[in-house]
Design a protein with these regions (language model features):
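Mg2+/Mn2+-dependent nuclease catalytic core
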Residues: 124-229
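Metal-dependent nuclease catalytic cores that hydrolyze phosphodiester bonds in DNA/RNA
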Residues: 1-135
Length: 230
């Protein structure tokens, strides 16, 4: 499938190419160029929903829970890769193994991307913050409706409201803060583009990144009080 848009890329140097990783069971740890060990933002935010996930597993059964989680992880990874290739102006964005339901999810969000995404600054880039003591990999930082934004592509089995995705907004706020720390370039907007199973109409959430920093700080503080990873 050939891209019908050409996206302009204006890369920004972070001062490093990649981050290292340390092996700690159950926790993703990044190692910064200075040798500091930071937990991933997904690990930190995952700690606040862990209890709810365990309750859900108990309710639906381990086998069904494993099936649903595997399906969600597979389709999410596949959609991210397609979006990354598309924004990189690659002609072939589907692999021979791309499933029909993933193509359907992509077709639902493609018009949103075409109509609103402008210059691309970063894609699938590692970021870390010495202020927060956390690291992670951002999906995309690009202009959205003319405003530099952290853009994340999500999938869901059903339509959601923003009350159910506060962790997404905190994640985006972290990426914005870490990017500013590394580049001194502010990113004030987060955009969550959510593709929904069997629904041609995606959901787009937009938030001010600064709005979620207070909640993010509290979650990190709680996580650091409960876990030791250094």
């Amino acid at each position: 499938m050939k891209s019908n848009r050409t996206f302009l890329h204006t890369p920004v140097s972070l001062g490093y190419e990649s981050l290292g990783d340390a092996s700690i069971p159950g926790t993703r740890i990044y190692v910064t160029p200075e040798g500091k060990h930071y937990p991933s933002i997904t690990t930190v935010l995952g700690s606040i929903i862990k209890e709810g996930i365990e309750q859900w597993k108990a309710a639906v059964g381990e086998q069904e829970a494993s099936r649903v989680l595997h399906h969600a992880g597979t389709r999410g990874t596949a959609l991210h890769l397609i979006a990354e290739k598309y924004l990189n102006n690659e002609a072939d964005i589907f692999s021979p193994n791309t499933m029909p339901h993933v193509k359907a999810l992509w077709c639902s969000i493609k018009p949103v991307i075409d109509a609103n995404v402008g210059k691309v600054v970063l894609q699938e880039a590692p970021l870390y913050s010495d202020i927060f003591g956390v690291a992670g990999r951002v999906d995309c930082i690009a202009e959205y409706e003319g405003t530099l934004s952290v853009i994340d592509f999500k999938t869901s089995r059903q339509r959601k409201t923003k009350d159910y995705i506060s962790n997404y907004f905190m994640q985006a706020a972290f990426y914005a803060a870490a990017f500013y720390e590394r580049t001194n370039i502010p990113v004030t907007q987060s955009v969550i583009i959510m593709a929904v199973d069997d629904d041609p109409n995606p959901i787009v959430f937009k938030e001010n990144t600064y709005k979620w920093l207070k909640d993010l700080k509290q979650v990190i503080k709680t996580y650091n009080g409960n876990f030791s990873y250094k």
